[in-house]
Amino acid sequence: MNIARSADGTKIAYDTTGDGPVLIVSVGAFCTRHTFVAPEELRRRFTVVTYDRRGRGDSGDTAPFTPQREYDDLAAVAAATGTEPPFVFGHSSGAAIALRAAAAGLPLAGIAAYEAPFPNEDTPQPALDPAEHIGELVRTGRRGEAVRFWMSEIARVPAEMLAQLDGAPWATALEALTPTLPYNVAVTARGVPTAELASITTPVLILGGANSPAWFRRSVADQAAATPGARLQMIDGYDHNIPPEAITPILIGFFTASAETPSVRRGDRTRRR
C-alpha cells in the first residue's frame, strides 16, 4: 500500500501493479481499491493504479465533503504515481469523477468512462432524498438499512439479490462504506454537466452496457454528445456491472491509440487535432 496526500491533507491509499504508462482506476459506490483486479493482459501494458476513494478502506476523510475534494484526490494519486498525465478508467460514479476532474483542469492522457450515472428525466426517482435519507440512517446507526435503500432505490437490484444480504459475510463490508454513499450522489445528482464536458480536451471514450436500462443508455449518449471528440461504444451482453476481463481489450485499444494522439499527454491543455 502507498499513500498520496490530497490538497486538504487527507491520505489516499493506493496500490500499483504492472508496468508501462500509468492507468488509474476510479471505482463506483461500494467499491475499494481491491474491487478492480487487473487482468494480466492489462498489467503487461500499463502500470495499473487502484485507490481507495476518500472515506473508504485505508484512505482518510475530511469534513465537509465537496465534489472538488474527489477531483483533488484523483489529482493527488496522479501526481504520486507518475510525471506524465495518466490514463483513467472510471466506472459509475468513478467515471463521473474522472470526467469532471478533467473538466476542472486535471491533465489526463485519456479517459474511458463506463456509465457515469448522471440522471435524466427517465431515471427512476426514489421516494426520499438519497443523500439526506442515507445520512440520517448512518447517523442513527442503521447502516444495514442504508445498504438496502441504496440497493433497492438507487441501484434497483432485484428482490432476490437483496435477499442475499441477510447474514452475508460481505454485508458488513458494504455497511462500512455507507457514509460515503452521499458522495456518489453529490458528483452526479444534477444530471449530465454539459458545460463542463464541453471544456474537456483529452481523448474520451464513453462506454455503456447494451443491456443497461434505457435511462443509462440515454445518459451515456448525452455525455458523448456533450464531450468534444468523444466516442461512444455500447458493449453487447453487459449492463452496469462489467468484469475487468470484458473491459480490458477495449481499454488497451483506446488508450494505446490515445497515446499516439496529440493531447494533454505532452503536458499542455491544447485541444487535440
Task: Set out the residue ranges of the language-model regions.
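Short beta-strand/loop motif that positions the catalytic acidic residue
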Residues: 200, 206-208
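Conserved HGGG/HGGXW glycine-rich cap/lid loop of the alpha/beta-hydrolase fold
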Residues: 3-60
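Conserved alpha/beta-hydrolase "acid-adjacent" motif
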Residues: 213-219
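Conserved hydrolase catalytic core segment
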Residues: 84-122
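Catalytic active-site module of serine/aspartate enzymes centered on a nucleophile-bearing elbow/loop
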Residues: 228-273
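Helix-rich cap/lid subdomain of alpha/beta-hydrolase
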Residues: 116-169, 184-185
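Active-site loop/oxyanion-hole signature of alpha/beta-hydrolase fold enzymes
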Residues: 40, 49-87
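Hydrophobic, aromatic-rich cap/lid helix
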Residues: 168-193
